[in-house]
Amino acid sequence: MNKLIPLPREFFARDTNLVSTELIGKVLYFQGTTAIITETESYIGEDDPACHAARGRTKRTDVMFGPAGFSYVYLIYGMYYCLNFVTEDEGFPAATLIRGVYVISHNNVYTIDTAKIKSQITDEKTQSIIIRKNRRIMKFYIPNLKASNLYLNGPGKLCKYLGINTSYNKCDLINNKDFFVSDIGLNLPYYSTTRIGITKGTDKLWRYIVTDPKMLY
């Protein structure tokens, strides 16, 4: 695969729902593992009752107030970590929660041909990607993990697989060679639905999911 280039800060410093939708199909790179983002969720401002910032600016939520393009990682239920990317203009608290990814490489060894995926979506010619066949990603024990062991459908699962915890909170995703988001030209179809795992703001259609994750298998 061509060298991955981090998205600019300007990408994140925009309307959160726009960022959340455009993150679908982008790739998350974390310490040698590359994964296609397949599901996101928006949390926007102090008027969003489900947003952590609805409780005001605290030590925990300070990162949400910007600047954009930083990671916001927190622990829920005392056992699961959640990865978010800070969005919007500095001073306005908002973030996109990364709810699902499809892992395509581990230790920089690719297991699927993303060019083939792209060709299924668009008629444009795509550049070949070198794949080392018969190499599988390391398996980790994650409860309820789907059989593929690659499609991580849940924020806790993806953080556990990648090894993301609160030590990676407030990481700059722009000036970083080990932890960032990149665009490889995938424009995956998606749909919007209500957010889950919350008790307030459940009417917002701010959750975005790849229409058919099986296109990545």
From Swiss-Prot:
Pfam families documented for this protein: Pur_DNA_glyco (PF02245)
Keyword vocabulary terms for this entry: DNA damage, DNA repair, Hydrolase
EC numbers for this chain: 3.2.2.-
GO BP, sorted A to Z: base-excision repair
Transmembrane portions of the chain: none
InterPro entries: Formyl_transferase-like_C_sf (IPR011034), MPG (IPR003180), MPG_sf (IPR036995)
GO MF: alkylbase DNA N-glycosylase activity; DNA binding
CDD domains per UniProt: AAG
Chain ranges of the RPE2 insert domain: 105-145
Family membership: Belongs to the DNA glycosylase MPG family.
Protein name as catalogued: Putative 3-methyladenine DNA glycosylase
Species assigned in the record: Rickettsia prowazekii (strain Madrid E)
